[in-house]
């Protein structure tokens, strides 16, 4: 039974990770680039923002 729960947990984790990364398709945000916030916004059609190292595109 633990194997089944482990398999379901791994499948869920991978699904979330794939959905998160394929949704944005924008480069990661780095603090060394002063224009990163603008680049993220441009990549997301004017609505993106940097959250930690990740560029987030709200609204799909």
UniProtKB/Swiss-Prot annotation:
Keyword vocabulary terms for this entry:
Chloride channel impairing toxin, Disulfide bond, Ion channel impairing toxin, Knottin, Neurotoxin, Potassium channel impairing toxin, Secreted, Signal, Toxin, Voltage-gated chloride channel impairing toxin, Voltage-gated potassium channel impairing toxin
Q: What are the protein's GO molecular function terms?
A: chloride channel regulator activity; potassium channel regulator activity; toxin activity
The record's section on Pfam families has: Toxin_5
GO cellular component terms, semicolon-separated = extracellular region
Signal sequence, renumbered to the chain: 1-24
Under InterPro entries, the record lists: Scorpion_toxin-like_sf, Scorpion_toxinS_Cl_inh
**Which residues are annotated as pro-peptide in the record?**
60
Cystine residue pairs? 26-43, 29-50, 40-55, 44-57
- Tell me the tissue specificity: Expressed by the venom gland.
According to its UniProt record, where is this protein located?
Secreted
Does the record carry Signal as a key word? Answer: yes
Q: Does the keyword Lipid biosynthesis apply?
A: no
Annotated function: Toxin with unknown function in healthy organisms. On glioma cells, interacts with chloride channels (probably ClC-3/CLCN3) and MMP2 at the surface of glioma cells. This complex is then internalized via caveolae, thus inhibiting the chloride channels necessary for cell shrinkage and tumor propagation. Has been shown to weakly inhibit Kv1.1/KCNA1, Kv1.2/KCNA2 and Kv1.3/KCNA3 voltage-gated potassium channels. In vivo, induces contraction, severe paralysis and death in insect larva of Helicoverpa armigera.
> What is the UniProt domain comment for this protein?
The presence of a 'disulfide through disulfide knot' structurally defines this protein as a knottin.
Which family, according to UniProt?
Answer: Belongs to the short scorpion toxin superfamily. Chloride channel inhibitor family.
Please state what the protein is called.
Neurotoxin BtITx3
Gene source species = Hottentotta tamulus (Eastern Indian scorpion)
């Amino acid at each position: 039974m633990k194997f089944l729960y482990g398999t379901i947990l791994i499948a869920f984790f991978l699904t979330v990770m794939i959905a998160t990364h394929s949704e944005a398709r924008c480069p990661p945000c780095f603090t060394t680039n002063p224009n990163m916030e603008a680049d993220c916004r441009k990549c997301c059609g004017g609505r993106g923002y940097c959250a930690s190292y990740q560029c987030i595109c709200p609204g799909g």
